[in-house]
């Protein structure tokens, strides 16, 4: 079967040198993202291609990770400010200082307990914050200097990548840690995502592969086609395929859940600096172009849009 190449579009963020990092869908069905270079939280409405930006109260906070919380707000990691932030869909911001100095919070997602969990890459800890702002940190069992990074809940536990430790970690809700070594040496695992079949997938930035973690912690590795592509982000699309960003190769890649490569597709702007990628409810995907200061839009196997006008404006439907 012939696979139709995706359409890739770019949307420029209003603020220069915004350096967008993590992006994810919010409770308002809009794409929220961190502007690490501008110390802002951004929001993109895919229905009308419009942006909103919310400045943080600290000008060099360096927001990185962001996630919707169980309370209907967005929560984010302010790495340089050493704080966890909360922003309402109206733009009201609250910052919560971390107990550990220079912890370097990075990745975050809401856990099965309704709390927001996050990594402290510089401190080598995993943290948890309640909707009320109470923070707990866990360190026992995590290899020192391992740099925990991406956070994903699975099976009533929190799983995380250890970018410098070459391991995948698992922490129970009460703080018990288990680590699983990655077969390849110095693979530098970064972003991770949960597949509907229960497996975890992560990028290996140094060894140019996607890794898969089964429910027992067994890890298999699947190489991508382009050498030294510098994989950064990964997500699962509506069709179950894995889509990922190739930072150095300036491409978006696609892989089947059995490890078969489907294709790699050039990003139509030089040196985009593709980082995070996330799936959307209608089958599209969105990614952050860190170096270009843009939000990328991927329409898999789609040739055109059907535009529909209504009382609330124009909407686009994928064909």
Model-derived regions, located:
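Short loop/turn segments that connect beta-strands within beta-propeller blades
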Residues: 45-49, 87-91, 129-134, 171-176, ...
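A short helix->beta-strand "capping" segment at the edge of beta-propeller domains
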Residues: 1-16
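A short loop-to-beta-strand structural motif that recurs across blades of beta-propeller domains
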Residues: 40-42, 82-85, 124-127, 167-169, ...
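Sequence/structural signature of beta-propeller modules
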Residues: 1-5, 301-319
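Beta-rich, blade/repeat-based domains predominating
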Residues: 16-27, 59-71, 101-113, 143-156, ...
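A short beta-strand motif characteristic of beta-propeller blades
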Residues: 9-13, 50-56, 93-98, 135-140, ...
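Conserved beta-strand positions in repeat-built beta-propeller and related beta-rich domains
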Residues: 33-37, 74-80, 116-122, 160-164, ...
């Amino acid at each position: 079967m012939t696979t139709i190449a995706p359409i890739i579009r770019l949307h420029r963020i209003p603020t220069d040198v915004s350096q967008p990092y993590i992006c994810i869908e919010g409770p308002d069905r809009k794409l929220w993202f961190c502007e690490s270079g501008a110390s802002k939280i951004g929001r993109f409405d895919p229905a009308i291609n419009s942006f909103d930006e919310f400045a943080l109260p600290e000008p060099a906070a360096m927001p990185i990770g962001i996630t919707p919380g169980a309370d209907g707000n967005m929560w984010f990691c302010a790495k340089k400010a050493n704080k966890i932030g909360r922003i309402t869909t109206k733009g009201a911001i609250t910052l919560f200082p971390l107990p550990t100095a220079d912890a370097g919070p990075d990745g975050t997602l809401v856990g099965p307990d309704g709390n927001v969990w996050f990594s402290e890459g510089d401190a080598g800890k995993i943290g948890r914050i309640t909707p009320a702002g109470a923070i707990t940190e866990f360190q026992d069992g995590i290899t020192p200097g391992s740099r925990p990074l991406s956070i994903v809940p699975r099976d009533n536990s929190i799983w995380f990548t250890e970018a410098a430790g070459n391991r995948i970690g698992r922490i129970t809700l009460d703080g018990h840690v288990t680590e699983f070594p990655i077969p390849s040496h110095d693979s530098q695992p970064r972003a991770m995502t949960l597949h509907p079949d229960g497996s975890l997938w992560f990028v290996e930035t140094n060894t140019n592969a996607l890794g898969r973690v089964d429910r027992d912690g067994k890890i298999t590795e699947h190489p991508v086609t382009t050498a030294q592509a510098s994989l950064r982000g990964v997500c699962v699309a509506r069709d179950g395929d894995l889509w990922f960003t190739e930072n150095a190769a300036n491409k978006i890649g696609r892989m089947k859940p059995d490890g078969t490569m489907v294709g790699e597709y050039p990003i139509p702007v030089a040196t985009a600096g593709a980082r995070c990628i996330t799936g959307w409810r209608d089958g599209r995907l969105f990614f952050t172009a860190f170096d270009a200061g843009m939000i990328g839009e991927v329409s898999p196997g789609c040739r055109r849009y059907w535009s529909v006008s209504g009382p609330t404006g124009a909407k686009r439907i994928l064909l």
